[in-house]
């Protein structure tokens, strides 16, 4: 059994001191000047969260801190762990540091930069399941649940549909062995049998992988010690988006009182988009008590900051920076509209922009752009109450297509790159677009398999591979 070793904990990080020279070094690379508040965050190596308001440069600070740590990192088999809910953190490092030796070092062993799901898959669930005799074939919620759904007898599917259930019922929910069907009988047994057979064939949903991670951490104390010795420092980016179950897993993997791992969360509790959905939350877990705070937003001035503070979750108050438009005292605007006028809202917003700024100003700041932002992109009428309107961006703009909205699409699976490639070919008729997306996917696959940035991102993905 792996034994707890204090010398493998956070005490060994005391030899890493971030100095003014280190700060000057990273400023020269990033072309960014850090003030005293930001330097304090860069130098801090305690288990403290960073509450960063919009436009405060949180990502820049995190990337800078990682670069300094990677430069000074003395350990061969223990690394820095960076967790997020998307691949944005990794992409930022690839974008800003990917062509430097430090960037390449950060993106390879012994360090890990990835999503919360991929971390627990890689270091906990996959080894645990393999030790129990499972071979892993596929990890994908939609595909796996759909496959299980068609494993059910036709009569059972028909019965479930009449009870407003679909393939989403074909996965463990909240606990291993628990599904969203309480009634005992054949229907429940058919569902459980389908899940069991599917798992024996190596097919799991994303949530099931987290449930098996919890099972492993509950049973194996040596696993917890091993994770802490493997990663003496952990950063959680966009920490406000971590839900209660993920927080529980992180606390089991890196117990706060163990003194074996430093854990720092970076985020803004006022921007919690994904966390606690459908949860009865009594206490917000981020930031923890005594956070380091970045109050100054470089995104807008004090008039907007003061307005936003009135509806903010954070006890700390945000402050803005005066800009060239501050003296105009442009009115804050809220649109009230009837259901039949929804499609006019974007036009009205566009007119407001044209009335507020001159053509010269719009041209000067065209790089920043004017944007319409919404949370719900994909139309799912069957799951949304009819009385709820608007349901998403598509109700404001009839021609909206969700998969075109993200210019920097980075799917998690190779097949998704191929699907995008095929769709773009059909739309444009350009084979070069098809080849570009296929090459992007292959590059991502190679780097993911190697767990390092073997193939660098370039303007010509085909040439790069």
Regions found by a protein language model. Name each.
Residues 1-465:
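The feature marks helicase ATPase cores and/or their adjacent C-terminal helical subdomains
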């Amino acid at each position: 059994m792996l034994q707890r070793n204090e010398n493998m904990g956070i005490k060994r990080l005391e030899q890493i001191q971030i100095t003014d020279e280190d700060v000057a070094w990273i400023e020269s690379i990033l072309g960014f000047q850090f003030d005293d508040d930001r330097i304090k965050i860069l130098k801090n190596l305690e288990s403290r969260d960073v509450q960063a308001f919009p436009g405060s440069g949180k990502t820049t600070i995190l990337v800078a801190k990682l670069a300094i740590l990677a430069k000074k990192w003395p350990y061969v088999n223990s690394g820095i762990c960076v967790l997020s809910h998307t691949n944005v953190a990794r992409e930022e490092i690839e974008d800003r540091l990917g062509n430097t030796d430090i960037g390449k070092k950060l993106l390879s062993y012994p360090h890990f930069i990835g999503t919360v799901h991929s971390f627990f898959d890689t270091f906990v669930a996959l080894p645990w399941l393999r030790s129990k005799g499972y071979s892993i074939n596929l990890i994908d919620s939609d595909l796996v649940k759909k496959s299980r759904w068609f494993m059910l007898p036709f009569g059972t599917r028909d019965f479930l549909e009449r009870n407003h259930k679909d393939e989403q019922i074909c996965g463990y929910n909240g606990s291993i062995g628990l599904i969203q069907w309480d009634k005992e009988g054949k229907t429940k047994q058919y569902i459980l049998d389908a899940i069991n057979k599917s798992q024996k064939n190596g097919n799991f949903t994303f949530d099931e992988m987290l449930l098996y991670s919890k099972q492993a951490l509950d049973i194996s104390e040596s696993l917890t010690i091993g994770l802490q010795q493997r990663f003496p420092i952990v950063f959680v980016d966009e920490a406000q988006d971590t839900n209660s179950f993920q927080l529980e897993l992180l606390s089991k993997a890196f117990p706060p009182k163990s003194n074996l791992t430093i854990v720092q969360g970076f985020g803004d509790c006022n921007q919690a988009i994904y966390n606690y959905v459908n949860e009865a939350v009594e206490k917000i877990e981020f930031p923890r008590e005594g956070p380091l705070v970045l109050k100054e937003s470089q995104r807008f001035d004090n008039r907007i900051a003061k307005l936003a503070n009135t509806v903010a979750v954070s006890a700390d108050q945000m402050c803005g920076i005066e800009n060239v438009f501050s003296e105009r005292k442009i009115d804050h605007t809220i649109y009230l509209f009837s259901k039949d006028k929804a499609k006019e809202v974007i036009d009205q917003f566009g007119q407001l922009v044209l009335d507020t700024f001159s053509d010269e100003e719009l041209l000067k700041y065209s790089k920043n752009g004017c944007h319409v932002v919404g949370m719900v992109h994909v139309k799912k009428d069957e799951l949304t109450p009819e009385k709820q309107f608007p349901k998403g961006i598509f109700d404001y703009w009839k021609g909206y297509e969700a998969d075109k909205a993200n210019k920097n699409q980075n799917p998690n699976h190779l097949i998704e790159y191929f699907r995008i490639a095929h769709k773009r070919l059909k739309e444009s008729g350009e084979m070069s677009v098809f080849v570009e997306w296929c090459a992007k996917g292959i590059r991502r696959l190679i780097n993911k398999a190697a767990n390092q940035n073997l193939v660098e991102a370039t303007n010509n993905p085909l040439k790069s591979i």
